[in-house]
């Protein structure tokens, strides 16, 4: 995440401007709170309960991947996958890659696009997330 001269994230309309190319654009906490009409404590609760994905860079700056939101609210399908993966022990950046990056397994689509294509695809991705968690836990 980039910094302005005053060491604050570079923002425009609630977006952190230099979000990585790997997980897409990010919202600031302020933007998410405004969009969801919740307090910062409410947002913290959503993060702690694995309902919203928050990423933190090496400088301690936080961002919320835009891909988990749809029409000014949390995308429930994406939220379900995020909750499964975070709850199963995956770190937030791995979850972001899992959800956002296109895969040949999904005909070159990312998880969000693939789940939106059909109920069968959504069911498949939820089952795959659960299987990945089971595999992770079996190996630790």
Residue spans for each PLM region:
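Non-transmembrane "mature" sequence context
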Residues: 1-140
């Amino acid at each position: 995440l980039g910094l302005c001269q005053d060491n604050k994230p570079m923002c425009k309309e609630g977006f952190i401007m230099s979000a990585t190319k790997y997980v897409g654009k990010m919202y600031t906490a302020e933007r998410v709170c405004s969009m969801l009409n919740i307090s910062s404590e409410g947002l913290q609760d959503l993060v702690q309960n694995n309902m919203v994905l928050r990423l933190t860079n090496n400088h301690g700056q936080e961002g919320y991947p835009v891909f988990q939101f749809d029409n000014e609210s949390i995308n429930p399908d994406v939220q379900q996958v995020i909750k499964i993966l975070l709850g199963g022990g995956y770190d937030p950046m791995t979850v972001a890659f899992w959800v956002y990056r296109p895969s040949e397994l999904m005909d070159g689509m990312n998880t969000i696009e693939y789940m939106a294509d059909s109920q069968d695809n959504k069911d498949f991705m939820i089952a795959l997330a659960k299987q990945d968690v089971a595999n992770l836990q079996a190996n630790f």
